[in-house]
Amino acid sequence: MTDGVILVFARAPEAGQAKTRLIPKLGPEGAAQLHSRLVHLTLDTATAFHNVSVQLWCSPDPHRSFFSQCRATYEVELHAQSGVDLGERMLNAFNQALTDYDWALLIGTDCPDLNIEDFEQAEQDLNNGIDVVLGPAADGGYYLIGLKRPEPNLFQNIPWGGSEVLSCTYTRLNEAGLTFSQLHEHHDIDRPEDLIRFPRLSDADVT
């Protein structure tokens, strides 16, 4: 058994399907291009973390040419997301990964400020006996969740995509008596106003 694995959840950057809340500002093609840049940035960071396997969990499926290119560039494993909602897809990924690894960190591709120090702190906390590590996002969600064993209650009946995801997750953690730690808060890119914080990632005039 290898020590740990990073699970990167990503959607194919298809115009009209990716970063839809940014389409009014960037247009379908521009939003898809930004999403592609975010996926590559995330994989750059994840694969730079020391001696940890990286799996790219793909939506709608891993057979898109974009994901094949990612596999060739980053030497990541490709997996298909499966489940009726985000929570079920995340839980299924953890269930599979934690049969082969001691711990797993699951991340999306919306957080440009995610860094190696976040991964190092999460790994340290899990190895020191913490049950769950969360990376809080400023919008009320989280950009990272780390586990040593699947915890179904953390992924069921959560209002995914809203501002209550993190608070609901903390409630579930407390109800289950799980120990948890929190990483530094970061901002996601989800809405046009978020682009102002990350001008290097978009050619759009956001001022």
Predicted regions and their residues:
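Short acidic/His/Gly/Ser-rich catalytic and metal-binding motifs that mark active-site loops
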Residues: E14-T20, R64-F67, Y142-L144
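A short, N-terminal amphipathic alpha-helix
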Residues: Q33-V52
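Short aromatic-hydrophobic micro-motifs that form the base-stacking/packing surface
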Residues: L105-I107
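N-terminal nucleotide-binding beta1-loop-alpha1 segment
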Residues: M1-L22
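Short beta-strand/loop segment that forms part of the nucleotide-sugar
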Residues: V52-P60
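Conserved donor-nucleotide/metal-binding helix-loop-beta segment in metal-dependent transferases, i.e.
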Residues: L114-D139
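Conserved alpha/beta core of the MobA/IspD/sugar-nucleotide pyrophosphorylase nucleotidyltransferase superfamily
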Residues: S163, S167-T207
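Short phosphate-binding loop-to-helix
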Residues: S68-W103, G162-V165
